[in-house]
Amino acid sequence: MYCIQCEQTLHTATGTGCRFARGDCGKTAAISDQQDALVAALLAVSSHADAARKVGLIDAEVDAFVPQALFATLTNVNFDPERLAGYIRKAQELRNRLQLALAGKPLALPALADADWPFAAAQQAEAGKIVALNRDAARIGEDVLGLRLLCLYGLKGIAAYMEHARVLGQTDTQVAAGFHAHMAYLASEPTDAKGLFAEALAIGTLNFRVMEMLDAGATGTFGDPQPTPVNRRPVAGKAILVSGHDLHDLLRILEQTAGRGINVYTHGEMLPAHGYPAFHAHPHLIGNYGSAWQNQQAEFAAFPGAIVMTSNCLIDPRTGAYQDRIFTRSIVGWPGVRHIEGEDFAEVIACAEALPGFAATEAPVTQLTGFGRNALMTAAPAVIERVKVGKIRHFYLIGGCDGARAERAYYADLARMLPQDTVVLTLGCGKFRLDGIDFGAVDGLPRLLDVGQCNDAYAAIRLALALAEAFDCGVNDLPLTLVLSWFEQKAIVILLTLLALGVKDIRVGPTAPGFLTPNLIATLNAQFGLRLISTPEETMAETLSA
């Protein structure tokens, strides 16, 4: 086992990364190795898909499958060996189909593309060891390995967003072509550091287009988000909790529970769903329960209803003994947990009806969400005017992925200390760090603006570009500071997107990605001013000194 893809990866005297019997996320060494085997199989498929495009062959099934299956290898997504084995078998089938289609064509493919490892289910962990991500670290050096992993984890993040967009009807053959080309590049086992660095930024550029697609899919399907108060307290009655990121699944659950006397709650990054007009038509979408993903074992154990995980992040449900009332969807999996194929949630509804639900209604406590792209752009003229007259001095984007490290208290501490002439934008499950802080308003404008899910960084980027145009300056000249919390691979690709757009002086934390060596961190600092978080006091002194 060698896994170093998330923020909570182990740091020991013998090295960085989860390398023993079990990762810190809970996946076993066998599952980790099986996921590495799946990654290798997908790199092989993409290598053939990239070659096929060069001779005019496009396989739509391949274009959909590879990102979806790669999504299954993200942190806290799929721990089910049978499901992973199925993805590997399918990858082999598609690779073989493309091989036949390309037979006789004079194409140069990397050795990985045509390799035949023992991918029978019982041997996949062994195959994973053959293709372990650090298998040639001694030969290529830690810097090149780190850059390869930066590209791979960026591709994992973009794969997740491509799948989210596909579910909402958004596909693009040019995006698929770019994705396969990047995968094929990695399959060639590159060793040129400059080339790898450029590739990482190109992945970030491609992701900007994918975030645009996802934004179009969400707003085209559900309408433009509107500022909406969300109840954060239970209401008496039967209950279903929907976690993850998939708005499509949430809508189907609401449609199928209408008139059944079941209240539906969002959890984690599903909270921004309340801002979309399409969900306002369902009054039994009653509120948001709980907070960020890392608290789910206690929160799910206390929830008296059925639970649906539509995407990451899933933690071992056995700890809270709720494995018999949690269901997985799409690419999510856990051994022994019931998986919902298709869009029929009858089993979930029956489970909720058999459970007690909440006995009493608590006094409401609300949180405002819904400051998506359109809402921000609509407010932009008023924001610009407040900046010009000195009522708003600085903007802070404080958000991203949350996690369990104590150092993450920095984000809430910084938000509390910021003066009243500053505005805070937040997104992702990092928003829950700011719970309980009374931000008030600046001349009628709320000081805290929840932009949405992690992928809604697109809306924040669009606002920054609009402000830069209005003030006739570059984005880096704006009174704007990005303070990002990262945890997994979606955050990595968003960071790459920001860097590809030329955004500088980003602060990230709570720790540096384990796959980035000191040399790579120094390079990112020199070229982009990228730095780790320090203390709230230092951040304020550095950003408000002018």
From Swiss-Prot:
Q: Which UniProt keywords apply?
A: 4Fe-4S, Cytoplasm, Iron, Iron-sulfur, Metal-binding, NAD, Oxidoreductase
Explain how, and how many, cofactor molecules are bound.
Binds 1 [4Fe-4S] cluster.
Binding-site list for hybrid [4Fe-2O-2S] cluster: 245, 269, 313, 401, 429, 454, 488, 490
The record's Pfam families line, in alphabetical order, gives:
Prismane
SUPFAM superfamilies registered for this protein in UniProt: Prismane protein-like (SSF56821)
Q: How is its activity regulated?
A: Inhibited by cyanide and by sulfide and iron reagents such as dithioerythritol, 2,2'-dipyridyl and o-phenanthroline.
Q: What happens when the gene is disrupted?
A: Cells lacking this gene are unable to grow with hydroxylamine as the sole nitrogen source.
Q: What does this protein do?
A: Could be involved in assimilation and/or detoxification of hydroxylamine, which is a toxic compound that may be formed during nitrate/nitrite assimilation. Catalyzes the reduction of hydroxylamine to form NH(3) and H(2)O. It has a low reductase activity with FAD, FMN, benzyl viologen and bromphenol blue as electrons donors, but it is not able to use NAD or NADP.
Q: What is this protein called?
A: Hydroxylamine reductase
